[in-house]
Structures are given as structure tokens and as C-alpha cells.
Amino acid sequence: ETAAGAYPIEAVQTMVKIAESTEASINYRKRFKERTTLVNPDITNAISHACCTTAMDLNASAIISVTKSGFTARMVSKYRPECAVVACVMNKKAYRQLNLSWGVTPIMMCQLEKNTDQLFDLAVDTAEKTGIVQQGEVVVITAGVPLGVSGTTNLIKVHVVGHVLMKGKSINDKVVSGNLCVCKTASELL
């Protein structure tokens, strides 16, 4: 049955059901764990694989890839991570192309920041504003240094979505984090 046939709507509905049931029946986590070696052991591929492994181990809500050409986001996508794959791009061509990649949600970023900390904050804030990630969730971020140069993917950061309201030192000299509740009255403490 084709679009020229007597039942084009039913044909498309059947194709959708087949595609959805096929995607749902594949255990991507198992397939990922069974993969023993990288097919193309270059830096971008290794970083993409490490991002997926880290996201799976930490049950991250998203992998955020700051990418100029979209290549890193596509490399992450090929491993079929369970979490969202967000591609932060600065040009429309890469944005349009990434709309066709499996599991990738491209979002436009208006500017390129001067350092990685600012860039990561902007990428996470942009993903949060679009509703892809929420406060308190863990995300894995990947990008390349020098910033804005295609083909330089070389770093990973694990980040908790939210803004640091205060810093201090724990009793055991280790890094800790937690939720902070700001109360203005004693009754709000309860």
C-alpha cells in the first residue's frame, strides 16, 4: 500500500505502529554493555562513548553536547543512550541536520561564551528553559577546547542542574551537595 493506494492513512498508521514496536523491543542498554571495543577509536568517538557510559552509570537525565557541526551529538546518538541527547548549536544548518538524528533534540544558542564554565552554564540554562532538564537533575556535558572550533571534542563534565546559592566545607573535607530551603519565618521550617 502506498500514498497512491486506497488506504494511505491506514498504511502510514501501520508503519508507525511497526516502527514504534520495533524501537520499544530493542534493549539499547544491553546492546551498549555488550559492545566491547570502539569501532572507530578516535577522540570524539571515545568521548561520546564515555558520555553515554557516565550518563548510564549516574542515571543522568540528559547528555548535552555543545557542538559546532553536530558531529559529536551524532556520535553520542549512535550509542542510543536512554537519556535525552541535547545538541546546543549556533548555526541553523547543523540545527536542521540534527533534527534527523536519532534521539537528538537540537536547540539554538545565540552566542558562544568566552570560557567553558560560561558555555556550560549557558547550555544547561538553555536546556532547562526548553523543559528538557529540571533543577536538581544530573546531566553530562561534552564540548571541545578551543571553543567554537569544529572537530575538537575533548572534554566531559558531570553537572547538577541548578545554581549554587552557597558554598562551604564539609566536616570530612569531601565535596558534598544538597538541597537548600530558604525560609523567611519559623513556620516555614516545618
What are these regions (language model features)?
Residues E1, T22-R35, S61-I63, V133-V138:
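Flexible, glycine/charged-enriched surface loops at secondary-structure junctions
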Residues E1-P8:
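Glycine-rich phosphate-binding active-site loops on the catalytic face of alpha/beta enzymes
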Residues Q134-L147, N154-K157:
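C-terminal binding/interaction regions
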